[in-house]
């Protein structure tokens, strides 16, 4: 098994329900034991090993992995999920923007990226990454968001290095619901380490480190 995981996602790829884990090196696959109904380590995927801080999987099976320091990778696995079939490295989302780190998130089922200057999204139909105008027009100041946590289908926490921001989705637009600056806490979060755990009853717990 792969130790030191930085992100874990339950997803379906090629019709198989699995847990994917990425860490500072391999991409690992976990499957559900049919007897115990518990997740167990299956294998490490061949063909990809890198410093990954977060990732998301889109509806078509693309794995979008954010490098710890620069760019993102788009991966597609073979049918047996044991090796990488396609790999594309994307160093920047727009010409002239050399921000380095690109964050990857999922918002209302859509893959969303941020690079500190804009939000972008992946268009399944065209296979292209384009500016996400819905957020850029109303909340350009949130373009340094590094994590999005879903409270429910219409409420989302945007996590920045200075605050937690709650946005609601109403009538086709995002609306500001609440801002919680880190200065309210005795021990401010470590950079890029803030997170939120949402319990089954909808309570949000703020993780500072």
Predicted ranges, named:
Residues 1-209:
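Carboxylate-rich, polar loop motifs that coordinate divalent cations or form catalytic acidic clusters
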């Amino acid at each position: 098994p792969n130790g030191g995981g930085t992100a874990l996602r339950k997803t379906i790829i090629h019709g198989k329900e699995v847990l994917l884990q990425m860490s500072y090196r391999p991409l690992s696959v976990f499957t559900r034991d049919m007897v115990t109904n518990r997740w167990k380590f299956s294998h490490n995927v061949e063909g990809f090993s890198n410093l990954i801080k977060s990732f998301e999987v889109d509806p078509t099976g693309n794995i979008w992995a954010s490098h710890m320091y620069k760019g993102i990778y788009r991966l597609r696995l073979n049918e047996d999920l044991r090796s990488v079939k396609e790999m594309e490295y994307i160093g920047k989302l727009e010409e002239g923007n050399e921000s380095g780190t690109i964050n990857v998130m999922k918002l209302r089922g859509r893959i969303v990226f941020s690079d500190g200057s804009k939000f972008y999204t992946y268009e399944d139909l065209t296979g292209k990454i384009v500016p996400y105008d819905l957020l850029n027009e109303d909340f350009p100041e949130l373009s340094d968001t590094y994590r999005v946590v879903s409270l429910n289908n219409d409420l989302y926490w945007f996590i920045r290095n200075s605050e937690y921001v709650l946005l609601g989705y109403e009538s086709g637009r995002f609306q500001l619901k609440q801002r919680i600056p880190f200065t309210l806490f005795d021990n401010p979060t470590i950079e890029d380490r803030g997170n939120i755990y949402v319990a089954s009853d909808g309570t949000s717990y703020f993780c500072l480190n």
